[in-house]
Regions:
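Structural core segment of the AMP-binding/adenylate-forming
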Residues: 77, 81-170, 288-289
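AMP-binding/adenylate-forming catalytic core of the ANL superfamily
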Residues: 89-115, 129, 278, 285, ...
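Gly/Ser/Thr-rich phosphate-binding loop
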Residues: 255, 283-287, 296-363, 377, ...
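AMP-binding/adenylate-forming catalytic domain of the ANL superfamily
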Residues: 142-145, 487-490, 519-544
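Conserved ATP/PPi-binding loop(s) of AMP-dependent carboxylate-activating enzymes
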Residues: 371-375, 386-421, 460
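Conserved beta-loop-beta connector loops within the AMP-binding
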Residues: 379-400, 439-440, 503-510, 545
Length: 547
């Protein structure tokens, strides 16, 4: 088998060659472009040929550090075509986070863009790639750079890297198309790093076969999507939603997918989502609750929604963080469309629970992600591993075996896979979330039970932030907690105790700490609050009390 064949070649051979596969819509650059299945297949085949000519073969790792542009999708699918293992790193991560992933994945090649483009801001990528490689013990053989006209990068400008950097477009022009390489169903398709409780990100390994089955099944059962329809997951390819529901699932299912380089607001206004839905005849929209809270904040009466009838839009799905009932009710009231909450994780790759519209639609219960998806035996246990009664909170677990598509292991660290997910309650996968199941079988997910917080749908480790704060010369002790935020769901809040005789003058230490977290994790952490305190609250055993 080959996942790229299922995504592209299969449809070209079975009557969808001229159907639009990918729509690129970039309000930050003003560019739009569409690719048919045939056109996208040709581009991916040539990109695979380019990688093959650099020596990339089945099993090699390729890190992709790119913004939301078509070439990012082409890079992912080109790796799949060759049987190489891609590891996409979110473009908002700083050089330190990229370096950690380079060292763990050991890529033969890094594929990057010259820059990312945010609202009124351009972020050069190559300087971060250069720093990450410098800081990592592993050195890739090549760095392929896609030059964006908004900010071209100077290649091979760093000492000692002569010939390492390759111009993407120039190399592609000389490359020949490459056929799909057969792989086994259990071969790794990709490694995607997610925040772990130890601070060090863990590489979730996804296999070709089970992943393809889960993607196809979920499009029918969860989203009730039909081949040929337009599916838009307003996320980023650097996250699991982007992997599963921008790239793989819609295309495996024969849908048209949208790649949106913009924001829910400020590109140019809170009508951005509605404009895309109207213009591209979107049938199914999927995003995080944070996006809709941002829209609600700037257009509380929903006046801009009225300007876009969106006749094709059938259903709005939300996931990535807890969907608060007021946001759900506001979106349903203003859009006149049903909102479906569903819950899943980077580790599973698809919905653990949701409303299976393609099988049977269940009545809505605000605050609940409805029922466990077929294949997931979801239970709630107490600290001893015993099942709890209905409506009683506990640890949300999944009885083994896990269904197709879930993580097979942690990259090069199977012991961490076992200890992190399978040891606490033998026979069960531990989700890391707490919640309860009511008397009707509805699942309510209430939040994390470890040190991972959810900032605007992005999983981040407070432990990793504490390591950074604790590394400051003036800091004796520190703690980071997740605080409620009306827009982002949670934001990190830091508390530090200074060493005796050390003092902050005009907030200099606080500023240094904020900058240090931004440099090492990135702006995605939204770390903007740190307070110097005399002491931290402790439990009787001497552990920092976080509540």
């Amino acid at each position: 088998m080959n996942t790229c064949f299922l995504v592209l070649d299969y449809h070209v051979l079975n009557g969808r060659a001229e159907q639009t596969a990918l729509i690129y819509d970039s309000p930050v650059t003003g560019k739009k472009k569409s690719y048919t299945y045939k056109q996208l297949t040709n581009e991916v085949a040539r990109t695979a040929g380019m990688l093959a000519e650099m020596g990339v073969v089945k099993g090699d790792r390729v890190i992709i550090y790119m913004p939301m542009i078509p070439e990012a999708v082409m890079a992912m699918l080109a790796c799949a075509r060759l049987g190489a293992v891609h590891s996409v790193v979110f473009g908002g991560f700083a050089a330190n986070e990229l370096a950690i992933r380079i060292e763990d994945a050991e890529p033969k090649v890094i594929m990057a863009a010259s820059c990312g483009i945010e609202v009124k801001k351009i972020i050069p990528y190559l300087p971060m790639v250069n720093k990450a490689i410098k800081d990592s013990r592993w050195k890739p053989e090549k760095v392929v750079v896609y030059q964006r006209e908004e900010c071209p990068a100077e290649l091979n400008s760093n000492p000692g890297v002569d010939g390492r950097d390759v111009d993407w477009s120039q190399q592609l022009a000389k490359s020949n198309p490459h056929d799909c390489v057969p792989v086994d169903a259990c071969d790794p398709l990709y490694v995607l790093y997610t925040s772990g409780t130890t601070g060090k990100p863990k590489g979730v390994v996804r296999e070709h076969g089970g992943h393809a089955v889960a993607m196809k099944y979920s499009m029918s059962v969860i989203y009730n999507a039909k081949p040929g329809e337009v599916y838009w997951a307003a996320s980023d390819v650097g996250w699991v939603v982007g992997h599963s529901y921008i790239v793989y699932a819609p295309l495996i299912h024969g849908c048209t997918t949208i790649l949106y380089e913009g924001k829910p607001v400020r590109t140019p206004d809170p009508a951005a989502f509605w404009r895309v839905c109207q213009e591209h005849d979107v049938n199914i929209l999927f995003s995080a609750p944070t996006a809709f809270r941002a829209i609600k904040k700037e257009d509380p009466e929903g006046e801009l929604i009225k300007q876009y009838p969106m006749p094709a839009l059938r259903t709005i799905f939300m996931a990535g963080e807890r969907l608060d009932p007021p946001t759900l009710q506001w979106v349903e009231e203003k859009t006149k469309r049903p909102v479906v909450d569903h819950w899943w994780q980077t580790e599973t790759g698809w919905a653990i629970s949701g409303n299976p519209l393609g099988l049977e639609e269940f009545p809505l219960k605000p605050g609940s992600s409805t029922m466990p998806t077929p294949g997931f035996d979801v239970q709630v246990l107490d600290e001893t591993g015993s099942p709890v009664a209905a409506n009683e909170q506990g640890f949300i677990v999944i009885q083994l075996p896990l269904p197709p598509g879930c993580l097979a292991t942690v990259w090069r660290n199977h012991d961490r896979f076992q200890s992190g997910y399978l040891t606490q309650f033998p026979g069960y996968y531990v989700s890391g979330d707490g919640g309860y199941i009511d008397e009707d079988g509805y699942l309510f997910v209430m939040g994390r039970i470890d040190d991972v917080i959810n900032v605007a749908g992005h999983r981040l480790s407070t432990g990793e932030m504490e390591e950074i704060l604790g590394g400051h010369n003036d800091v004796a002790e520190c703690a980071v907690i997740g605080a409620h935020d009306a827009l982002k769901g949670q934001i990190p809040y830091g508390f530090v105790v200074l060493k005796d005789g050390h003092y902050s003058v005009d907030g200099n230490i606080e500023k240094e700490l904020l900058q240090k977290v931004r440099e090492e994790i990135g702006a995605v952490a939204s770390f903007r609050n740190v307070m110097i305190v005399n002491r931290l609250p402790k439990t009787r055993s001497g552990k920092v009390l976080r509540r």
